[in-house]
A protein has these predicted regions:
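Substrate-binding cleft of extracellular glycoside hydrolase catalytic domains
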Residues: 1-104
Length: 104
């Protein structure tokens, strides 16, 4: 059996987590780098929970000072006990990414 989910960010409507039928979970972008905080993460989590979806939050990782970014994510994420926390490790908009050494 497959489980379907979506990931959303501030680029999606606040009610996006509830607007797609058949989704079991929603991963919500909470933070990026060491300064950005999503202004829609709380509303998106509320919408997901209202529709019975499991909720997770992710941090978009930039190269450099991974410890500071991890602290920023934990401090600013709108998670509650039982939510999933994850890191989105991919190429950034300026074509860079955290190295394997930084990631580990």
């Amino acid at each position: 059996m497959l489980t379907y989910g979506i990931d959303v960010s501030a680029n999606n409507p606040e009610d996006a987590p509830g607007s797609m039928p058949g989704m079991s979970f929603v991963m919500i972008k909470a933070t990026e780098g060491h300064t950005y905080v999503s202004p829609t993460q709380k509303a998106q989590a509320t919408a997901a929970r209202r529709h019975g979806r499991a909720v997770g939050f992710y941090h978009f990782l930039w190269p450099g000072n991974i410890g500071l970014q991890a602290h920023h994510f934990v401090e600013k994420c709108a998670s509650t006990p039982g939510d999933i926390l994850a890191v989105d490790w991919e190429q950034t908009t300026d074509n860079t990414h955290a190295s394997n050494a930084e990631k580990d």
